[in-house]
Amino acid sequence: MFGTATRDNATRVLLLGSGELGKEVAIECQRLGLEVIACDRYADAPAMQVAHRSHVFDMLDADALQQVIDLEKPHFVVPEIEAIATSKLVELEAQGLNVVPTANATRLTMNREGIRRLAAEELGLPTSAYQFADSYESFAAAVETIGLPCVCKPVMSSSGKGQSVIRTPEQIEAAWQYAQQGGRSGAGRVIVEGFVDFDYEITLLTVRAVDGVHFCAPIGHRQEDGDYRESWQPQVMSENAIKAAEYVAEQVVNALGGYGLFGVELFVKGDKVIFNEVSPRPHDTGMVTLISQELSEFALHVRAFTGLPIGQIVQYGPSASAAILGQGQSQNIQFNGLDDALSIPHTQVRLFGKPDIAGRRRLGVALSRGKTTQEATDRAIECAKAVKIHY
């Protein structure tokens, strides 16, 4: 039973993180009459613009997080980012707080070490070779053990921050320093991963709901500087590869538990899949589902965590998304070229409403459909390029 937003009987959803993904979750909550409270470390974040109320605080501050939860008394706490005081969520969940999908899932996936050890060591799933290091000396030793080339990442970061590929011994020290600068909560532990030989990588959006585990069509994507540039759905895969991907994804989401949508990242080589990472929430590459599916990843997430059935996931056909990236300094961002962008057949644009930019930032996404995923991707890229950003 749902109450009515703004009334005493409201069903309240507290978003921890209010970026573009949180904004779409907030909109889907609004469609079900839920009361939305959006939180982030800065004011006027995208989800705050479509929420009933908002709070600005450092979500790594356990005391501040406790205060907001005590004030709002949410029925659902929905993390959108990794940088949260997850130990506090675990503590509060034990007292009856409903954390989506679970506090333990949020804790394990907030850094790469927890989820990698779960997948490889507890579940026995295929992953790249890896070692962890928390000093330069142990890092250099890990690189020697794994061998070159290898990948270095902070255990806690997103959007490619702090990630680099080490190809020569001369790059080792610089990779360590870069990882220390790129961690979400400051300098600290890193993972060194062996290079994976793969044909392509996918995101398999997997929904754990009251009526079972459901899979969206696989999403292919292209990364640059550790961040997604384009994604498309469906990614063509062999039947055996799809079965292997669904098996790995189901093992992971069942181990994490709870209800919600998970973005399971996998490398694919022929019929074989290798687990990479998982987000217990909507995924940036999944923004393509805003145009490719009857129910977007955001609608699926909200349905799942509120205990509603998913039923059949309907995919409309070849579709794609392309990030609209800004590079500059401004607190008064403006856009034009939308008339040109939207004159391209079967395209849509989402501008996120981010209040400022300092460097590189994703400010929107272009969406398109086509007869093939290549046609859809080409249209999405053309659409994104047509949007001009003024700083």
Curated annotation (Swiss-Prot):
N(1)-(5-phospho-beta-D-ribosyl)glycinamide binds at residues 20-21, 80, 284, 354, 361-362. Its EC number is 6.3.1.21. The keyword Ligase applies. This is Formate-dependent phosphoribosylglycinamide formyltransferase. Mg(2+) binds at residues 265, 277. Keywords: ATP-binding, Ligase, Magnesium, Metal-binding, Nucleotide-binding, Purine biosynthesis. GO terms for cellular component: cytosol. It comes from Vibrio cholerae serotype O1 (strain ATCC 39315 / El Tor Inaba N16961). ATP binds at residues 112, 153, 158-163, 193-196, 201. Involved in the de novo purine biosynthesis. Catalyzes the transfer of formate to 5-phospho-ribosyl-glycinamide (GAR), producing 5-phospho-ribosyl-N-formylglycinamide (FGAR). Formate is provided by PurU via hydrolysis of 10-formyl-tetrahydrofolate. SUPFAM superfamilies: Glutathione synthetase ATP-binding domain-like, PreATP-grasp domain, Rudiment single hybrid motif. Residues 117-306 form the ATP-grasp domain. InterPro entries: ATP-grasp, ATP-grasp_carboxylate-amine, ATP_grasp_subdomain_1, PreATP-grasp_dom_sf, PurT, PurT/PurK_preATP-grasp, PurT_C, Rudment_hybrid_motif. GO terms for molecular function: ATP binding; magnesium ion binding; phosphoribosylglycinamide formyltransferase 2 activity; phosphoribosylglycinamide formyltransferase activity. Pathway: Purine metabolism; IMP biosynthesis via de novo pathway; N(2)-formyl-N(1)-(5-phospho-D-ribosyl)glycinamide from N(1)-(5-phospho-D-ribosyl)glycinamide (formate route): step 1/1.
